[in-house]
From Swiss-Prot:
CDD domains: S-AdoMet_synt
Full protein name: S-adenosylmethionine synthase
Keyword Membrane attached: no
GO biological process: one-carbon metabolic process; S-adenosylmethionine biosynthetic process
Subunit structure: Homotetramer; dimer of dimers.
Annotated positions binding ATP: 16, 174-176, 241-242, 250, 256-257, 273, 277
Gene: metK
């Protein structure tokens, strides 16, 4: 009997409480960067019934109307009705932001290398904290992402499209998806085994109507027919009712959906969240750089699967480690790939910021439906512009 395995990933909609918090944090970051690209920002958000708290550390010359940014973000998501228990114009907004610690700032503003005499401008900025970050790519999808998380994101994005267009008028903003994919003995996806979708809805909507609409207009519109068969299981609103949702149903916090934000559990994660952080925080910028490296390695044909780990010390510019793992799929030794990566990519924080142009207000758009593998927006870490350089670097190393 051939050995087959299942793997499951989930996603959540922009109206999920944790994602509301992420989007508010990144909307604040973008508003600040639009006025002050050199700002240091660590903005956290908590949402619950009727209230939003924004707190954290910020050093900037910009002045922004946080109250307005918060309300506009909530309205864009779709929380505009008082009956939702959380409405853009009626929530209480409570900001509590202070200046970044001087002890941290001195290591970020002048890295150890700079203090020791390195005059390279890109050695001037130190990492904003210690930590380890992972990036991943695999040739399962055109965007080089694992199939389970790719499908999960597409399902909740489709729900949002149908809600905002009015095609399914009873939908409300909160939703979750989960997709289980079956893999063959060669680790190739062969079918979708299970799809779970829970979507918030108006009280008059019936379970039968919701199931029919979600299967026909969401699942079958997103998942290729070749992956669906008579044995594929659908669980649509399996509790039977999902009227109370969003922050009325659960509180939400920035940074609680880090697996949704990345690879759906298919790859390792260093533990650091992204939203609300400027690019001097390597939790964010180095994770983007690691994805950029992994995607270009796979696209270059140097591996069919690649995971890149980067690690940093606070106040130090150069990474303390760079690791490439291809799970036995590389065409050359992994040590060669690591050497090529170091040759092609400047992985100092300032190098990453320059390479990916990360001082721009581009972050709010990443705060729902994944930071990696996006095909609907132009993100610099998704570009395949290092393929030739990597191939040439491998030749020089060999």
């Amino acid at each position: 009997m051939s050995e087959r395995k299942l793997f499951t990933s989930e996603s959540v909609s922009e109206g999920h409480p944790d994602k509301i918090a992420d989007q508010i944090s990144d909307a604040i970051l973008d508003a600040i960067l639009a006025e002050d690209p050199e700002a240091h920002v660590a903005a956290e958000t908590c949402v619950y019934t009727g209230s939003v708290h924004v707190f954290g550390e910020i050093s900037t010359t910009a002045y922004i109307d946080i109250n307005r940014v918060v309300r506009d973000t909530i309205a864009e998501i779709g929380y505009t009705e008082a009956e939702y228990g959380f409405s853009a114009e009626s929530v209480g907004v409570h900001p509590s932001l202070v200046e970044q610690s001087g002890d941290i700032a001195q290591g970020v503003n002048e890295a150890l290398e700079s203090r020791e005499g390195d005059t390279d401008d890109l050695s001037h900025i130190g990492a904003g904290d210690q930590g380890l970050m992972f990036g991943f790519a695999i040739n399962e999808t055109p965007e080089l992402m694992p199939l389970p998380i790719s499908l999960s994101h597409q399902l909740v994005r489709r729900l949002a499209e149908l809600r905002k267009s009015g095609e399914i008028s009873y939908l409300r903003p909160d939703a979750k998806s989960q997709v289980t994919v079956e893999y063959d003995e060669h680790d190739k996806p062969v079918r979708v085994d299970t799809v779970v979708i829970s979507t918030q809805h108006d009280p008059e909507a019936t379970n039968d109507q919701i199931c029919q609409d979600v299967i026909e207009k969401v699942i079958k519109a997103v998942i290729p027919a070749d992956y669906l068969d008579d044995d594929t299981k659908f669980f649509i609103n399996p509790t039977g009712r999902f009227v109370i949702g969003g922050p009325q149903g659960d509180s939400g916090l920035t940074g609680r959906k880090i697996i949704v934000d990345t690879y759906g559990g298919y790859s390792r994660h260093g533990g650091g969240a992204f939203s609300g952080k400027d690019a001097t925080k390597v939790d964010r910028s180095a994770s983007y750089a690691a994805r950029y490296i992994a995607k270009n390695l796979v696209a270059a044909g140097l591996a069919t699967k690649a995971e890149v780990q980067l690690a940093y010390a606070i106040g130090v510019a150069q990474p303390v480690s760079v690791r490439v793992d291809t799970f036995g799929t590389s065409t050359v030794p992994e040590a060669v790939l690591e050497a090529a990566v170091r040759q092609v990519f400047d992985l100092r924080p300032a190098g990453i910021i320059q390479m990916l142009d990360l001082k721009r207000p581009i972050y709010k758009q990443t705060a729902a439906y994944g930071h990696m593998g996006r095909t609907d927006i132009d993100l610099p870490w998704e570009r395949l512009n290092k393929i030739d350089a990597l191939v040439e670097a491998v030749k020089t190393v060999l």
